């Protein structure tokens, strides 16, 4: 089934608060997908989330917190017609909660406990607009990675298997199920959150594609990119003629230090930038980058040479 964009209209638009007007839903059929459909789904999500007027060095940027709509819904359709809908903040793609069809005709919503105030009300009314069929089953922990890892019972996300089949299986363990453990829910959430991470990073999208028909564990580069998205976004935004304001120390797939000096070194891995205020360059002269290329090679050589000597 082709990834589709569904615009929520009619009565919803009248009753919903201003902040959630015209919330859009991206639909992804996890149960019968292909690499091509997965790529289309992520493109749809990025296009829905990005600010069409903001780019740095050709990389789209997410909007600020004042932009409407404030949220994006992602409906995941699993095998056996089971579904779960994720609610994301548009300005950073953080997962705020999710809903699932429950007890034949009810909508059950689940919200992280670090979502509060107006946002919490928005999640409830956006995921389950009909108050007469709304059922609450809150997530009794916050959305931070360390908390989710603790609930799953692992020391690191590197121990959690990812993949399309894993996501499909996890949907079946949650959607419409009366009772499930915090461990089961946290396992689902850790995998589902990778949708946001893949939307942010082409590198993570490509990891999923490479391992499309099997489960896989995230490598050190995946984990590092997830933890430094804000820092990477700011560095690219503040770059002058493609040169970062200061060396950016990251980690490659093997776990070795990766020193980034130029936008074009990291650009192939990045699909969306976190919002950074102020203007930035949209293009740069590639021919002017040769000295920085030499310097970058030197930085990485020296950084990893130092690590090599530390082992003795």
Curated annotation (Swiss-Prot):
Propiece residue ranges: 284-312
Location of the active site: 197
Disulfide bonds: 56-280, 107-128
EC class: hydrolase
Pfam family name, one: RIP
Record-stated family: Belongs to the ribosome-inactivating protein family. Type 1 RIP subfamily.
Protein name stated in the entry: Heterotepalin-4
